Design a protein with these regions (language model features):
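Glycine-rich phosphate- or other oxyanion-binding loops that anchor nucleotides, phosphorylated ligands
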Residues: 1-162
Length: 162
């Protein structure tokens, strides 16, 4: 197991480091997310990642699209692994989301898109499961801290079932 740290840069670096050192062909990401769509304490498998904070719309690009990066799409799709979990679209950004994101998604995190992009570039399968800690609202920072330990326990149980 490896801890990526918080944010897209930390996640991208750790994913690259782990893949380079281990030569793995699949990376399993277990983390937390906020959602106004899914219930708190629910496990959700991410089947698509988008960037909720990439905004170069002033230059004519859609929100979520990285300019001059035609090789990799704004949305990165993942093949589901866990048949018994709800599936969701995760908007990743380097901010703690407390409002409605500008891109279509039903959960939010701070690392997933970066992991997905590194995995896609290196031809590594990514499986990502998020524990919903909060409602991605004004109380999110309080709920996240309160629910972090519960999430770790539930994610560990899922990991041990594999």
């Amino acid at each position: 197991m490896h801890y990526s740290g918080i944010g897209k840069v930390n996640a991208a670096f750790k994913a690259f480091e782990v893949i380079q050192k281990t030569g793995c062909t699949t990376l399993l990401n277990l983390g937390t997310a906020g959602s106004s769509h899914f219930q708190a304490h629910e496990l959700v498998e991410v089947t698509r990642f988008v960037q909720r904070d990439m905004d170069v719309s002033a230059l004519g690009f859609e929100v979520g699209v990285t300019p001059m990066d035609q090789e990799y799409p704004a949305a990165i799709d993942l093949v589901p692994y866990f048949k018994h979990l709800s599936q969701g679209i995760c908007g990743t950004g380097d901010s703690f989301e407390t409002a409605t994101p500008k891109v279509a998604c039903n959960l939010v995190d701070m690392e997933g898109y970066a992991l997905a992009k590194v995995c896609k570039k290196l031809n590594v399968r990514l499986i990502s499961v998020k524990y919903i800690t909060d409602g991605a609202d004004g109380a999110a920072h309080l709920d996240w801290q309160e629910n972090l330990l519960l999430g770790a326990q539930k994610l560990l149980k899922l990991y041990q079932s594999i």
